[in-house]
């Protein structure tokens, strides 16, 4: 109460921030008359003057902001016949300050972006504008290019349909580059698999504006971008696990110390499966194993867990669809089909086994990054969306981004009515149909929002029975999305849409529809996130238009059933609500919002937890990529690095074969054999007589240096350095891929450390650090072994880089789409070998430590 009184007197923090921006808007408005009297050439000359001041360092962007914004506004009037409103100037300043501008639907975010884009492009370092799909990227770039071109800037677009690096490089070399989050992220990963700097397509990560920032940085935060390759693992386990899962009985969750009945319990809140002791015993019997959770059966246990999830947590036409005998993911936030994406950790294979379609092979991660860590690389990050305040805490804690709500140019007239809640879904469905009939009878357009494809088709069938013409927009027919959404505001239109409801495409209405009350939004279920509900509401009432929104709920809806239905049910029972009757109350609406807050909090903690783990891998990724970039630099002294590695290798090998610390007793027979095998070099025991430990290490290093120099004498220095660089890169890349595989295994099992009263995150940091130290040593020593073992003639040496690039390109082409396409490159004779058995190659190592290592080898290591 006291806080509300303070806000009434002093305003909210947001109000105070907006007030500051309005002061600067007045200064920009004062300049408008100066620039509108100039000719085109004079206006361009004025802008060029400010640009030169930025490039010379005489002034910075903040110094020239008022003039540049005034010039961009004038340019918009001349080229597009569009003048930036005062609130749009505020939006532009918010973006320039590296914050999130929350602007309602129809407020012109596309035009707003031109202000900070132009201001930040003046430094020549490039500006990226990110949208959620190719259509919007292309549309926005084409529409706004008139402003950019007038002021002398080049504009590029990065599209998924572009096949060549040349097109992408041309787009990134432009002053301003539009594209999707996926393409920007994948290009970054692909760049860090290239063998020369000239082949890289991206420039530095200077300034980025993310459109629909909540969708990209919140909804997709848990979906990493993955470039994947094939593994040699068998798929039979998924078929067995699917059969076992079908025979296991679901039990009900109980509070400890009581033990649940049945073979497993479904934890819907955390979307997890808990197998009971009885379930473990049954699974062991059905699989024919003694201990399901022994090390040898770890993969089988994991496959069973995924099979149970596939049967109990994932529904067809809700979480995925079947198309052409393939399991296609339905994005839970947009309702779109996610072509080319696959669930990770074997879940997709479990769903394929469940649906009895061809099981595609598992993939091995070759390179990955989350959107969280990709966008945090930029020197300055900003975003725009119509719905951000509900996630302001997460934006602040994860991305250090403040959210500023920008006032609308014209006040919102939409009526947001309280929810109507029914006891059962059937009652709710009937009530929705009746409401549609009423609105349709007078010609008022209706947009019906559903949470899944399944629900949209339920309403479709009911409307067909009522003979009400309508359109259905869901993942199965998303190709017509823009056309359907554009017509949704016409007289008599009834449109059923999943959450995808055309973000970025405005629903416009005419005066006749305004007189009928505007577009009527009917939500048939509350989403887990208030933000998604607000997006649906925001389809109506754009730019001061009238409109209505209302949600119809039932106690059988997932959100209420899992997170808060008991309280509402007790209220309905006390009020004696009969079948077919509903309850409408602010208390009930608040109870629903509290349930949503619980879910949002759970998801936030989940994303935060994942980021804590990913930050560990991210630091390692940055270290490896930084070193990889050094290797690509022609001025990098690769020869000095090789000499250093030879010295470390020599010290390491010598220590391995010393029988005492004094160095007087060395196993020279085994040492000679190892050096001959790994470095193709003969050594004599006499060379090491009467030497100290340090002297022996130095002597071995000197012998290997001389041997290496003699071996490479026949090659020209330039060719030699190029060979060394390419081979070193291949060793680094293969070692990094193997490291990612080991990190995946570590992450999968680390949660079990909690049962031993240890913090899994602390354990993960410790173990991953040890793995990283092993990785560094593997790169050093494997590069030495490889450089000593290769044999080249002049022609092979000259073609090495081309061959490496060709192999890399093949690997990328088979696996760029978020782990989509996976080809088995494994040798047939290795497929059936148990992981702990001796490797058939004769190395003497266990298969899992030799040819059983996951992931494709590349280049000369293949």
UniProtKB/Swiss-Prot annotation:
Name of a matching Pfam family: SecA_DEAD
Membrane-related topology note: Peripheral membrane protein
UniProt cross-references to CDD domains, sorted A to Z: DEXDc_SecA, SF2_C_secA
Transmembrane regions listed in the UniProt entry: none
InterPro entries: Helicase_ATP-bd, Helicase_C-like, P-loop_NTPase, SEC_C_motif, SecA, SecA_DEAD, SecA_motor_DEAD, SecA_preprotein_X-link_dom
Chain sites annotated for binding ATP: 88, 106-110, 506
Keyword rRNA-binding: no
Subcellular location: Cell inner membrane; Cytoplasm
Record GO biological process: intracellular protein transmembrane transport; protein import; protein targeting; protein transport by the Sec complex
Keyword annotations from UniProtKB, A to Z: ATP-binding, Cell inner membrane, Cell membrane, Cytoplasm, Membrane, Metal-binding, Nucleotide-binding, Protein transport, Translocase, Translocation, Transport, Zinc
Protein EC: 7.4.2.8
Cofactor note: May bind 1 zinc ion per subunit.
One MF annotation (Gene Ontology) recorded for this entry: ATP binding
Residues holding Zn(2+): 839, 841, 850-851
GO cellular component: cell envelope Sec protein transport complex; cytosol; plasma membrane
Cofactor: Zn(2+)
Record note on quaternary structure: Monomer and homodimer. Part of the essential Sec protein translocation apparatus which comprises SecA, SecYEG and auxiliary proteins SecDF-YajC and YidC.
PANTHER family per record: CHLOROPLAST PROTEIN-TRANSPORTING ATPASE, SECA INNER MEMBRANE COMPONENT OF SEC PROTEIN SECRETION SYSTEM
Family stated for the protein in its record: Belongs to the SecA family.
Role: Part of the Sec protein translocase complex. Interacts with the SecYEG preprotein conducting channel. Has a central role in coupling the hydrolysis of ATP to the transfer of proteins into and across the cell membrane, serving as an ATP-driven molecular motor driving the stepwise translocation of polypeptide chains across the membrane.
Record protein name field: Protein translocase subunit SecA
Species name: Campylobacter jejuni subsp. jejuni serotype O:2 (strain ATCC 700819 / NCTC 11168)
């Amino acid at each position: 109460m006291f806080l509300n009184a303070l806000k009434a007197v002093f305003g909210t923090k947001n109000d105070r921030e907006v007030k500051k921006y309005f002061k600067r808007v007045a200064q920009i408005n004062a300049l408008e008359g100066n620039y509108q009297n100039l000719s085109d050439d004079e206006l361009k000359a004025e802008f060029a003057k400010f640009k030169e001041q930025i490039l010379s360092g005489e002034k910075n962007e903040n110094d020239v902001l008022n003039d540049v914004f005034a010039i961009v506004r004038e340019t918009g009037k001349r080229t597009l016949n569009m003048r930036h409103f005062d609130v749009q100037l505020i939006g532009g300043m918010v973006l320039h300050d590296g914050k999130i501008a929350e602007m309602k639907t129809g407020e012109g975010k596309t035009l707003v972006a031109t202000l900070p884009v132009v201001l930040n492009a003046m430094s020549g370092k490039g500006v990226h504008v990110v949208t959620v799909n190719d259509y919007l990227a292309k549309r926005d770039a084409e529409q706004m290019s008139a402003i950019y071109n007038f002021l002398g800037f080049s504009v590029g677009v990065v599209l998924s349909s572009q096949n060549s690096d040349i097109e992408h490089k041309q787009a990134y070399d432009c002053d301003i580059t539009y594209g999707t989050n996926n393409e920007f992220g994948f290009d970054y990963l692909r760049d860090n698999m290239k063998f020369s700097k000239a082949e890289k397509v991206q420039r530095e990560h200077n300034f980025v504006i993310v459109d629909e920032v909540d969708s990209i940085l919140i909804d997709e935060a848990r979906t990493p971008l993955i470039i994947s390759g094939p593994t040699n693992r068998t798929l039979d386990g998924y078929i067995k696990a699917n059969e076992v899962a079908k025979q296991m009985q679901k039990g009900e969750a109980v509070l400890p110390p009581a033990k649940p009945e049945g073979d497993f319990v479904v934890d819907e809140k955390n979307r997890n499966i808990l197998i009971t002791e009885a379930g473990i015993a049954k699974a062991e019997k059905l699989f024919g194993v003694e201990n399901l959770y022994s090390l040898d059966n770890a993969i089988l246990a994991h496959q069973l867990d995924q099979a149970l999830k596939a049967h109990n947590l994932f529904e067809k036409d809700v979480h995925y669809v079947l198309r052409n005998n393939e399991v296609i993911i339905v994005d839970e936030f947009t309702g779109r089909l996610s072509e080319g994406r696959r669930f990770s950790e074997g879940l997709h294979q479990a769903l394929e086994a469940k649906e009895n379609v061809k099981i595609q092979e598992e993939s091995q991660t070759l390179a990955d990054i989350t959107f969280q860590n990709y966008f945090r690389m930029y020197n300055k990050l900003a975003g725009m969306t119509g719905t951000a305040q509900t996630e302001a805490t997460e934006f602040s804690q994860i991305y250090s981004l403040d959210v500023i709500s920008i006032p609308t140019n014209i006040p919102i007239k939409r009526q947001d009515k309280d929810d109507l809640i029914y006891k059962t879904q059937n009652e709710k469905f009937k009530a929705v149909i009746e409401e549609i009939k009423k609105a349709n009878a007078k010609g008022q357009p209706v947009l019906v929002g559903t949470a899944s494809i399944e629900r949209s088709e339920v309403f479709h069938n009911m409307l067909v029975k009522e003979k009400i013409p309508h359109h259905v927009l869901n993942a199965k027919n998303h190709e017509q999305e823009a056309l359907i959404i554009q017509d949704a505001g016409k007289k008599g239109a009834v449109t059923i849409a999943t959450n995808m409801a055309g973000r970025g495409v405005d629903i416009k209405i005419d005066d006749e529809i305004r007189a009928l009350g505007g577009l009527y939004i009917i939500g048939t279920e509350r989403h887990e996130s208030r933000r998604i509900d607000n997006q649906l509401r925001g389809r109506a009432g754009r730019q001061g238009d009238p409109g209505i929104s209302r949600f119809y709920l039932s106690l059988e809806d997932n959100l209420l059933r899992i997170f808060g239905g008991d309280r509402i049910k007790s209220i309905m029972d006390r009020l004696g609500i009969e079948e077919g009757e509903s309850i409408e109350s602010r208390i009930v609406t608040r109870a629903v919002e509290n349930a949503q807050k619980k879910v949002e909090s759970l998801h936030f903690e989940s994303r935060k937890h994942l980021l804590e783990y990913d930050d560990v891998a991210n630091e390692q990724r940055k270290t490896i990529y930084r070193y990889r970039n050094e290797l690509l630099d022609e001025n990098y002294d690769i020869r000095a690095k090789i000499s250093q590695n030879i010295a470390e290798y020599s010290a390491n090998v010598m220590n391995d074969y010393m029988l005492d610390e004094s160095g007087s007793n060395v196993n020279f027979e085994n040492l000679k054999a190892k050096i001959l095998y790994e470095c193709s070099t003969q050594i004599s025991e006499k060379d090491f007589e009467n030497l100290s430990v340090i002297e022996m290490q130095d002597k071995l290093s000197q012998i290997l240096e001389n041997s290496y120099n003699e071996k490479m004498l026949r090659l020209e220095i330039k060719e030699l350095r190029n060979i060394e660089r390419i081979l070193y890169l291949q060793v680094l890349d293969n070692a990094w891929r193997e490291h990612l595989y080991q990190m995946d295994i570590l992450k999968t099992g680390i949660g079990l450390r909690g049962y031993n009263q240890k913090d899994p995150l602390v354990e993960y940091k410790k173990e991953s650090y040890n793995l990283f130290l092993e990785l560094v040593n593997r790169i050093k020593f494997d590069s030495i072994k490889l450089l000593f073992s290769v044999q080249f003639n002049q022609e092979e040496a000259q073609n090495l880089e081309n061959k490496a690039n060709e192999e890399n390109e093949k690997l990328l082409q088979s696996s760029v789409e978020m782990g989509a396409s996976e080809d088995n490159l494994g040798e047939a004779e290795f497929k059936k070998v148990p992981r702990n058995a001796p490797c058939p190659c004769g190395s003497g190592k266990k298969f899992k430590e030799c040819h059983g290592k996951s992931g494709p080898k590349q280049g000369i290591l293949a």
